[in-house]
Amino acid sequence: MRFAVVTFPGSNGDHDALMAIRLGLGHAAELVWYTETDLSRFDCIIIPGGFSYGDYLRAGALARFAPVMSAVAREAEAGKPILGICNGFQILTEARLLPGALLRNASLEFVCDWVWVRVEQTRTPWTSQLAPGTLLRLPIAHGEGRYYVEAEELVALETNGQVVFRYVDADGLPTADANPNGSVANIAGVCNERGNVVGLMPHPERAYDRFVGGDDGLRILASVLSVGLEVAHSPR
């Protein structure tokens, strides 16, 4: 499979994602500059973390207007697997490819730590090889990671099975103490209605090697392989 890792001015997680795909999965990955307008040659797309455009206005607000995002939207419509990590998640919500918004952390502080997340849905390409309730230990590093939707939309997300990851403690319980940023309902990641576009605040690409902290993130990245190949070879 061939992965695109989209790079914006200010991205800093692009090389992490590149190495996770190349070294962790053993698949081809290419850095794609924000001016690119055609992503059809790729099987999967990753929008990495960082501070695109310096987070001016708010995180992801300017990146949504980059030329590459029109291409991302086309591939999302075609059903291609797309993963937004941290700032990539923020960009996808700003582009309305994912529901909700990412606000300042409840603490008003930048949070850098390791957290537990629980897999809530396995209908997405990025969780297809995981069992519901699987616990993953992943790193976080963000200042605007508090996921928010109105109460009515939260009910819809839960009903539609769009909550993909939830912050929990080591026992798998979604407690207040396990919530690092004040996200509504301890939500760490969501998907679109179709399930092919996923965004999460934790960094799976920084957890692909057990010798440098853990390899739970590799389980997310590896899940896309079988589903991604099916999409790549389906009629467009």
UniProtKB/Swiss-Prot annotation:
Keyword Hydrolase tagged: yes
CDD domains per the UniProt record, alphabetical: GATase1_FGAR_AT
A Pfam family the protein falls into: GATase_5
Catalysed reaction, written as an equation: N(2)-formyl-N(1)-(5-phospho-beta-D-ribosyl)glycinamide + L-glutamine + ATP + H2O = 2-formamido-N(1)-(5-O-phospho-beta-D-ribosyl)acetamidine + L-glutamate + ADP + phosphate + H(+); L-glutamine + H2O = L-glutamate + NH4(+)
Principal localisation: cytoplasm
Catalytic activity, EC: 6.3.5.3, 3.5.1.2
Glutamine amidotransferase type-1 domain mapped to chain residues: 2-234
Cellular location(s): Cytoplasm
Active site, UniProt feature: C86 (nucleophile), H203, E205
Keywords per UniProt: ATP-binding, Cytoplasm, Glutamine amidotransferase, Hydrolase, Ligase, Nucleotide-binding, Purine biosynthesis
GO BP annotations listed: 'de novo' IMP biosynthetic process
Keyword match Nucleotide-binding: yes
GO molecular function, one term: ATP binding
Entry GO terms, CC: cytoplasm
Pathway assigned to this chain's UniProt record: Purine metabolism; IMP biosynthesis via de novo pathway; 5-amino-1-(5-phospho-D-ribosyl)imidazole from N(2)-formyl-N(1)-(5-phospho-D-ribosyl)glycinamide: step 1/2
PANTHER family membership: PHOSPHORIBOSYLFORMYLGLYCINAMIDINE SYNTHASE SUBUNIT PURQ
Subunit structure: Part of the FGAM synthase complex composed of 1 PurL, 1 PurQ and 2 PurS subunits.
Function (record text): Part of the phosphoribosylformylglycinamidine synthase complex involved in the purines biosynthetic pathway. Catalyzes the ATP-dependent conversion of formylglycinamide ribonucleotide (FGAR) and glutamine to yield formylglycinamidine ribonucleotide (FGAM) and glutamate. The FGAM synthase complex is composed of three subunits. PurQ produces an ammonia molecule by converting glutamine to glutamate. PurL transfers the ammonia molecule to FGAR to form FGAM in an ATP-dependent manner.
Protein name in UniProt: Phosphoribosylformylglycinamidine synthase subunit PurQ
Organism: Thermomicrobium roseum (strain ATCC 27502 / DSM 5159 / P-2)
Gene from which the chain derives: purQ
